[in-house]
Amino acid sequence: MFLVKILMGDNMNHEIDLQKYQIRTDLAIDLISNKESIKGIKSSKKTIDNIKITDVYIDDEGSKSINKKSGNYITIEFEDVTDYENRQKVKKIFVNELKQILNNNNITNDDSCLIVGLGNSNSTPDCLGPKSLENVIVTNHLFVYGEVEKGFRKTFTLTPGVMGTTGIETGEIIKSVVETIKPGFVIAIDALASQSIERVNKTIQMTDTGIHPGSGVGNSRKEISRDTLNIPVIAIGVPTVVDAVTIVSDTINYMFKHYSYNKNNIDNPINKLIPSTSLNYLNKEINVTEEDKKILMGTIGTLENEEIKQLIFEVLTPIGYNLMVTPKEIDFLMDKLSDIIGNGINNALHNKVNEIN
């Protein structure tokens, strides 16, 4: 049983059982980034144009260790998609990685595709799926009524809404449509939750394991995967929200780094020329010592990162203050992210579509 011991007074130890609390994240990379190695999990990293691509494979043994379904997870991490040039670079990598995951699942150029936009179109941080579909090329009706130029495949789109507005399980709607139109494979797009502030709106995850809509915010619905639909399901998502636990725990870690950096560079003449609010200490190499942590936070400062997160979770959750938070510019970012995903899918699915057209 996982226990965190918090010193209370001089001679009293208070034990808090935190095993029953689960930190919210949909990203596989969140669960492995702070661990040196986990049995049953293989990962490789590469960087192109300052964009990080992490390829993770989880087998059955690794699946039990981190409670993630076995399969392939590709994560693309970037800094800024509001700039056109950067957005085009991210889109190019997204297309290449999506083509790779389609190839790994033996999906051919002739296989038809149902693209599903999961989420609530009336909630800005949750509208990634429906908004991405606005950019997707639909061709099935063109195949029905006439010849289509070579280089395009049959594509359909579906926006099933959310159970709160339809009263129907999202997975059941998708399953019914799949049984009727019989696509070769499904691409499901959804907004995700992250365990890191740094990854919010700056990460795209692709996986061939399918998806549990709403799982990142504690509203888990029926699984949408090969197991339930009997065809390949590629899930694509971007973390658009974090919970209060993540914000508080990340702030504590940044506080440690800020203190250590300033302590070690107090006499550095360069820092005297830079306003304190403009100094990005995260770009510096910082060695945060246990002594630094204890000076700032006492006994809590000696806890591991995961222990701090779970302790904060226990403090906030019972009183209903573990809120889900999104950046104030989310509507602007959603426009850019949906462009990358929607038009990126067009490029990956249709040989005739490229960056120019």
Predicted regions and their residues:
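Helix-enriched interaction subdomains in cytosolic or periplasmic regions
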Residues: 65-93
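Short glycine-rich or small-residue beta-strand-to-loop segments that form or flank ligand, phosphate
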Residues: 75-79, 112-123, 157-161
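Conserved acidic residues
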Residues: 113, 184-185, 233
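Gly/Ser/Thr-rich loops at beta-strand to alpha-helix junctions
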Residues: 118-126, 164, 191-195
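A structural-propensity feature for long, helix-poor, extended segments
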Residues: 150-178
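A structural signal for small-residue-enriched, beta-sheet-centric alpha/beta enzyme cores
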Residues: 158-159, 188-356
